[in-house]
Amino acid sequence: MASLGLLLLLLLTALPPLWSSSLPGLDTAESKATIADLILSALERATVFLEQRLPEINLDGMVGVRVLEEQLKSVREKWAQEPLLQPLSLRVGMLGEKLEAAIQRSLHYLKLSDPKYLREFQLTLQPGFWKLPHAWIHTDASLVYPTFGPQDSFSEERSDVCLVQLLGTGTDSSEPCGLSDLCRSLMTKPGCSGYCLSHQLLFFLWARMRGCTQGPLQQSQDYINLFCANMMDLNRRAEAIGYAYPTRDIFMENIMFCGMGGFSDFYKLRWLEAILSWQKQQEGCFGEPDAEDEELSKAIQYQQHFSRRVKRREKQFPDSRSVAQAGVQWRNLGSLQPLPPGFKQFSCLILPSSWDYRSVPPYLANFYIFLVETGFHHVAHAGLELLISRDPPTSGSQSVGL
């Protein structure tokens, strides 16, 4: 993976951050080691949580683990070259081995819980499928949509059909890089936000990883640029309202996917600090804050619009300590739907096995259960990339506000 000057980007940015970070800067080896230790400690706690809940985690959750495992390989190689980071490099190696073992063990449970889904998407669990960026760019604010459209036509089922066509893993023995007219329309539809937008980005990221270059897939980078510009806009909105809990999952997912897309401006030190603060120290997962913040309460009070949330397979753990938080569907991050009467909130949530929102009563499907991922890959992308980059940014990239 190419190095880039995220350190200089953070120090030389023309625009001041919305909130400054209390983490040490990255201008010395000592400060890099301090932050690296914080990140690794968070990932190690999350790994313990993963190992304890492995039979309950679905394929989507394990895909995130695979992405992190690939990331750790690059991190270990680079940290081994710096004396102060060498001990941490050994920890990275041990963590990577644990994650690889967890992925292999998970295949047994996935074959039992959802064999069809595993057959269709097992390719994304294979080593080498996820290719880390070799060059870095920044989002272009001029590509942000003036308004977001309705998400009614977007669903997990339709998205899965398109992804299977692209991978070529369907039962019809189709070749990879397939693209029907329906999928072309769905995956290039303008005005998407939230999980609709992240599904679109995922489609074109996978197209690039599969080497698909026919038709609209020849313009994969153009669509990736478009989608990540809008995901950056949504992340800034989430930051502006104080990282209200219902926005955190998509906030982290945007960092992961656009980081994989090569957008260095998603790696902000203050965003890393925020993500690290969301981890439950004892449990290791990333879940519901202890108390609702003022911004969330205000947003809920004044919300007017919402749209159905499209999130790849998720579910509560059976021994969670309270009823699921019925969550939010939003067209923008200021539109938050309040909880249905009688619903409480989780303290720890994850991407587990086989729960599907399509099987719940209609009123719950409309609100949809809001769950949050373990954060393995999100913390890695928001943090580890900050620590393995060195090359100074170009003059164009310096103009991007962090």
UniProtKB/Swiss-Prot annotation:
<dbReference type="InterPro" id="IPR031751">
    <property type="entry name" value="DUF4735"/>
</dbReference>
<feature type="signal peptide">
    <location>
        <begin position="1"/>
        <end position="20"/>
    </location>
</feature>
<dbReference type="Pfam" id="PF15882">
    <property type="entry name" value="DUF4735"/>
</dbReference>
<protein>
    <recommendedName>
        <fullName>UPF0764 protein C16orf89</fullName>
    </recommendedName>
</protein>
<dbReference type="GO" id="GO:0016020">
    <property type="term" value="C:membrane"/>
</dbReference>
<keyword id="KW-0732">Signal</keyword>
<dbReference type="GO" id="GO:0070062">
    <property type="term" value="C:extracellular exosome"/>
</dbReference>
<dbReference type="GO" id="GO:0005829">
    <property type="term" value="C:cytosol"/>
</dbReference>
<dbReference type="GO" id="GO:0042803">
    <property type="term" value="F:protein homodimerization activity"/>
</dbReference>
<keyword id="KW-0964">Secreted</keyword>
<keyword id="KW-0325">Glycoprotein</keyword>
<comment type="subunit">
    <text>Homodimer.</text>
</comment>
<comment type="similarity">
    <text>Belongs to the UPF0764 family.</text>
</comment>
